[in-house]
Amino acid sequence: MKKYDVIIIGTGAANIVLDAALKQGLQCAVIEKGKFGGTCLTRGCIPTKVLATAADYIREIQDLPKIGVEVEPAKMNWDIISRRVWEKIDEHKEVLRHYQKYANLAIYQGSGFFTGEKTLQVKLHDGSLSEEMTAEKIIIDVGARTNLPEISGREATGYICSETLFGDKYPKQPYKSLIIVGGGPIGCEFSHIFAAAGTKVTVVQHNNRLLSKADEDISEQIRQNMEAFGIKTYLNANLLEAKKADDQKTLLFEDRETGERIEVTGEEIMYATGIKPVSKELKIENTSIEMDERGWIKTNEFLETSVNGIWAIGDINGQPAFRHKANYEADILAHNLFGGNEPGKWRWARYDVVPAVTFTYPQVAQVGLTETEAREKGYAVKIGKQFYHNTAKGYALGFTSGDGMDGFVKLIVDGATNNILGVHVIGAQASLLIQPFINMLNMGTVTLKPINEEIGSETAQELRKLGLTRTLDPHSVISVGETMTPHPSLAEVIMWTQYYFEGK
């Protein structure tokens, strides 16, 4: 049995924790079945935004005549754009080389799984099994994968998803036509990317609106914008069958409202149908780690699982699946476990100020409650709404009333206190406009609120009894680092400056 101080499964946000442990001189092991760097770097938010940025410029150039600038029609050079995508993805090699330099780190490349309460093995890439290992501290950060729908003909027809698109199924040129199943953030972003590249895009969405977790006003506006760009959207769709004939793929679905059966055809089908946990691969059943009914690992406000000495961060714990949220959790663990801080100075996670940004055209950003959520919680809701075109800068940018690209900001306010409950933005640079509200909602004094109260080490239980509070001073640079910043956005430049003061 090999013994380590720390074992980390996954090399996404958990690298923040790993760095802190290595800095302490602890004997560490890291297990990674794929490319180093996690989903975000290798097949998620970063390569997607490289593509989305090119698509943004296509749309912006098309809008330039509104402000008196005439240009030749723009088009994507897919080869150059793709080279930039893969240059970024290939940084995973540098991440691996960086960690190979540490004498106090063992790297296992393969699929890790539990053999007992705190024992692990790895099925290495060559097919062999590693020696069993254990550690005082184990951190799970294994992400999630696409939740493929159960539909007749899916495998025989073939498909792509975010995992395979940035893998062996990356297209040499944009598809002539593409069916995207799913109208959440991933589906909407890829519809923007490929439509701007000249692809005929059809979106088939099970829900009755796009971006179903966004405010309803935002959902409707993004649907109208997508339709204006020639993206056909179908809502309330129950999938029935996928099939292939020659070089075309067909998707059959039923409209739940009308009962009508509809067929759509395209060169490729992409499933962007949410995510599911990978807990089965970890063989969690060999431990006492509690999961919810879907298989997400349950954690408390200190990221502890139901097994002492095992923590879980990132997508696998079932909280909002964003890299900035995972980074936030990793920072908390690094602070609590390896920052030399007594329990009384521990940080804890809160999930009421988790921002979300969707890089469609225009962008969508939100933090806090939607109008519907606020009313359901019993608040005396007041709404403030303002359009870009009503500002001088909005006019300068060419936005006009009734223009589908004209953005707006919507504030959800508690009428009894005038406290902001939620902020929703659709429009140019929404990812930047949302940041001041994230900061505002995160500042002040917050009392520890238990999450999954049945989970808790002795230390966690004692801290709960103390009724700990933590104050984030809006004047302190430390508060910048403890506030989530949407990833990837330019607002991260501001957030990263605080590392200078922490010596990172």
In which residue ranges do the predicted regions lie?
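Flexible, glycine-rich terminal cap/loop adjacent to redox cofactors
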Residues: 7-14, 19-34, 46, 50-57, ...
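Glycine-rich dinucleotide-binding loop and its adjacent helix/turn
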Residues: 45, 142-200, 204, 232-233, ...
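Beta1/beta-strand and adjacent pyrophosphate-binding region of the FAD-binding site
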Residues: 1-12, 174-184
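A conserved FAD-binding loop/helix module that cradles the flavin
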Residues: 214-217, 221, 313-373, 432, ...
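A Rossmann-like FAD-binding core segment of flavoenzymes
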Residues: 72, 106-109, 113-126, 197-301, ...
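FAD-site-proximal beta/loop scaffold in flavoenzymes
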Residues: 157-174, 263-343, 436-443, 449-453, ...
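Glycine-rich flavin
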Residues: 2-4, 19-26, 31-175, 207-211, ...
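Short hydrophobic core segments
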Residues: 7-9, 112, 120, 132-143, ...
